[in-house]
Amino acid sequence: MTASTKDILATAIRSIPDYPKPGIIFRDITTLLGDAAAFRLAVDELVKPYEGLGVDKIAGMEARGFILGGAMAHQLSAGFVPIRKKGKLPYRTVSMAYALEYGTDEMEIHVDAVKPGEKVILCDDLIATGGTAVGAVKLLRQIGAEVVSACFVIDLPDLGGRKALEALGVEVRTLAEFSGH
């Protein structure tokens, strides 16, 4: 990806200081999603490394991962798997607890969402501490998925999420980095 492309994408992301609490800068991708050219560019850049790899499924994390993952799945002619908060899926599920800043939560997928050995890419808008993404990788592996890679529009490298995923042997790809929180 060129420096110009990185600049276009980073500029399309709104930064909101002191949200949701003082000292945090919230990186809001709704401005990128609302800009047709920037949204197209982001999806094109997200799928580029995976073209021709025979990816079976894109797994998107609730909620913005659904938007990006659905677009990626369409472009790669792959299926889409929603990873949801516990209690939101209607069929039999498997679940995984994951760490939050203060406590834990649970996510789940349908038991038949991925066949053993299928190649899956995990997708979300942002990687921070990696707690949710690590939980999602473990959940996908629990039902036999081969997690090929994880991709995100935004990386907050100071929070260590990329390193947490790489420690699990997962390749991580991102489009824009923002320092700090």
From Swiss-Prot:
Top enzyme class: transferase
Protein name, UniProt field: Adenine phosphoribosyltransferase
InterPro entries: Ade_phspho_trans, PRibTrfase_dom, PRTase-like, UPRTase/APRTase
Keywords: Cytoplasm, Glycosyltransferase, Purine salvage, Transferase
Gene symbol of the encoding locus: apt
TM segment ranges: none
Metabolic or biological pathway: Purine metabolism; AMP biosynthesis via salvage pathway; AMP from adenine: step 1/1
Family membership: Belongs to the purine/pyrimidine phosphoribosyltransferase family.
Subcellular location(s) per record: Cytoplasm
Taxonomic lineage of the native organism: Bacteria, Pseudomonadati, Pseudomonadota, Alphaproteobacteria, Hyphomicrobiales
Gene Ontology biological-process annotations: adenine salvage; AMP salvage; purine ribonucleoside salvage
Quaternary assembly: Homodimer.
Pfam families found in the cross-reference section: Pribosyltran
